[in-house]
Design a protein with these regions (language model features):
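Acidic/histidine-rich catalytic cores of soluble enzymes
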Residues: 84-85, 114, 183-279
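C-terminal segment of N-terminal export signals and the immediately downstream linker at the start
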Residues: 24-65, 76
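Hydrophobic faces of well-ordered beta-strands that scaffold small-molecule active sites
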Residues: 58-64, 85-87, 111-116, 163-165, ...
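Conserved, mostly hydrophobic/aromatic
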Residues: 77, 85, 155, 255, ...
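Active-site acidic/histidine proton-transfer and metal-coordination neighborhood
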Residues: 13-20, 68-71, 123-225, 310
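Acidic (Asp/Glu)-rich catalytic clusters
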Residues: 51-55, 74-79, 95-115, 152-159, ...
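N-terminal secretory signal peptides and thylakoid transit peptides that target proteins
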Residues: 1-17
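Acidic-and-aromatic substrate-binding clefts and catalytic sites of carbohydrate-active enzymes
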Residues: 64-71, 87-99, 170-174, 205-210, ...
Length: 325
């Protein structure tokens, strides 16, 4: 994630995808683009949640904001020839949930998760990030717990089986009070999602893989999983995803297909780039996911706007289709 707030990126993505309309007919004909709490028990373990139900093949998707027009947004996913998506919504209400569910059914698109952020300011860097992102900051924690619960209810109304979010810079030191507070908050949210019949997913990025595994095990519920954002691990300088998958693989329920470069400035994240131009080794990671019998979605994410975003998404689709085949 770059400094730009993810919500801003997702808000622009739907409008940008409107530029894809001229290629709808070709896509329908199958013509591919030529472009390339403090009382937790630290001894408990969370059972692994499988992504292999139904043994579906690996399938591609797109992350996007739906704005106030779910039909138009989901139509873009359909016209790209993608069978799945992850969705972000700004406003959570029953009217919008009905329209989103209707659009998903109409176009036969599977929404694999609802992406949740905020409320409040989130700064995507190494200095303000620890103070503003996710459930770690005390000042915004209660409001965000309430917001994620509301999002869980919204997802249930839409028939979406998972809710995911950045939980923040989870402390490396499990002995500090803020770690125990964060685990308690995560347990409360994961428990709420479980009662709604959903999985709760952690988006990788701000924490090291072993810290995330520790938090999952300390929360101790069986509906937790990981949305494995391949580039974020690099952008935050936390791990090479090729190595991280050995720690996180059993928990992976979703993938963000995104590329990036390592940080060169210790104050700023690394740079997100088009797939194939960064440091993510997609062939090795996809091969390892297959060995682990992963059967979830591989969701394309490109954090820019304008015509270049469209070109990069189309190229990523062609490239990834070859790898997941």
């Amino acid at each position: 994630m770059t400094k730009r707030n993810r919500r801003t990126f997702l808000q622009t993505s739907t409008a940008v995808l409107a530029a894809l309309s001229p290629v709808r007919a070709a896509l329908r004909r199958g013509v591919a683009s030529e472009s390339f709490a403090s009382n937790f028990d630290t001894t408990q373990s969370a059972p692994t949640v499988s992504s292999n139900e139904g043994k579906k093949p690996l399938r591609l998707g797109l992350i996007l904001g739906i704005g106030r027009d779910p039909n138009d947004a989901i139509a873009k996913v359909h016209d790209l020839g993608l069978p799945t998506c992850q969705v972000f919504v700004d406003e959570i209400d029953s009217v919008l949930s009905g329209r989103l569910r209707e659009a998903l059914n109409k176009y036969q698109i599977e929404a694999t998760s609802l992406v949740v952020g905020g409320p409040g300011r989130e700064a995507w860097d190494f200095y303000e990030g620890p103070l503003t992102i996710g459930l770690v900051p005390r000042e915004t924690r209660e409001a965000r717990i309430a917001h994620i619960k509301k999002a869980s209810d919204f997802a249930k109304q839409c028939g979406i089986a998972a809710v995911q979010t950045h939980c923040g810079f989870i402390p490396e030191n499990p002995n500090v009070p803020v770690y125990k507070e964060t685990v308690a908050a995560l347990r409360e949210i994961a428990g709420y999602c479980k009662r709604n019949g959903q999985n709760f997913r952690y988006e990788t990025g701000q924490e090291t893989p072993i810290t995330l595994v520790r938090a999952i095990q300390d929360v101790g519920l069986d509906n937790q999983g990981v949305n494995f954002d391949l580039a974020n691990l690099i952008l935050y300088g936390k791990a090479n995803p090729v190595d991280a998958i050995e720690l996180l693989g059993q928990y992976v329920q979703g993938i963000h297909a995104k590329d990036g470069l390592w940080p060169t400035n210790p104050r700023q994240l690394g740079q997100e780039v088009a797939i194939g131009k960064g440091k993510v080794d997609f062939p090795r990671i996809i091969a390892r996911l297959k060995e682990l019998n992963y059967r979830g979605a591989v969701t394309i994410e490109r954090e820019i706007s304008g015509p270049q975003q469209v070109e990069d998404v189309r190229a990523a689709k062609v490239y990834l289709e070859k790898l997941i085949a």
